[in-house]
Amino acid sequence: MIKTAVVILNWNGEAMLRQFLPSVIACSRLEGTEIYVADNASTDASCEVVEKEFPSVHLIRLDKNYGFADGYNYALQKIDAEYAVLLNSDVEVTEGWLQPMVDYLDTHPEAVACQPKIRAYRHRNLFEYAGASGGFIDRYGYPFCRGRVFESVEEDKGQYDEVIPVFWATGAALMIRLDVYRNVGGLDGRFFAHMEEIDLCWRLRSRGYQLVCIPSSTVYHVGGATLKKENPRKTFLNFRNNLLMLYKNLPEEELKPVMRVRTFLDYCAAVVWVLKGDFTNAKAVWNARREFFRIRSQFTANRQQNLAHTVLKTIPERYSFSLVWQAKVKGRKTFSALSH
């Protein structure tokens, strides 16, 4: 068994591999570390690029495009390691990025997963949308980060350099104990893409495991390389999967009241898009809710299993406020300004 497996999931990312794999190889020379590219049945020359240009990288060929969640699930079945790092193909890592995370997990057995600080690749002084300096969630399922609240991204001035527990760690650069990943069922493949890492992290936190952000490790993320922001497909997946995540994980006494408020908030979001003349994204919200109700029963067994294994009903990193109220109504656009 190796110590750390850095696993990059790829789909038609030939250009991204050429651009970012060199930094991963050069900066991941920690003893016991191996690098893998798991290819989701790309139709471009991705596999040939890995084999010919990066012979030190292990290539895992998947037979079809399984999406983010099952793509990683199937790839990780083929890897024997203590730690796995789920790393997006559009991430530039920095020298020594692995060491602080490995050291932390080695010395903190209560912690099962962590993420580095995520900065924006194109605006390198800013935090990056997908993970910034650690993820949190509000009462109604809205995710936010130290360094990012809705679309407002902060400049990194060292204000969030403390190692702290988080509710979720970004799937763009997620280090996790592989045995625990398997024990809790891994990523939910039915999500396909979006929200699946938050769902996984909720399962981990409710079982009493700790997740942290390690800001002394820094990477740079392009973001939006698969589905662009404001893409109706992305809107659909985000809204549908967020509802599924709530259904799977909310304590029984919270399920109905939270879902009632979410109905109101979701339709408010759709109305905002209509007022902007963006009818395709408004329709995506409607379709997401309709799809949620159509397939909800398929997740009932998962909900019962999650509740049966819950040891933390109240998770400190799941804040009791409404992020919509705090950010959209009160205008609080930074993590430190939110009323915790």
What are these language model-derived features?
Residues 62-79, 89-91, 100:
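Glycine-rich, basic loop-to-helix element that forms the pyrophosphate-binding segment
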Residues 4-7, 207-304, 309-319, 323-324:
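Active-site-adjacent helix/loop segment of glycosyltransferases
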Residues 161-218:
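A short, conserved alpha-helix in the catalytic core of glycosyltransferases
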Residues 23, 39-48, 64:
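A conserved acidic beta->alpha catalytic loop
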Residues 22-32:
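Short, acidic, metal-binding catalytic loop of nucleotide-sugar glycosyltransferases
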Residues 84:
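Short aromatic/hydrophobic "clamp" motif used to bind/position activated sugar donors
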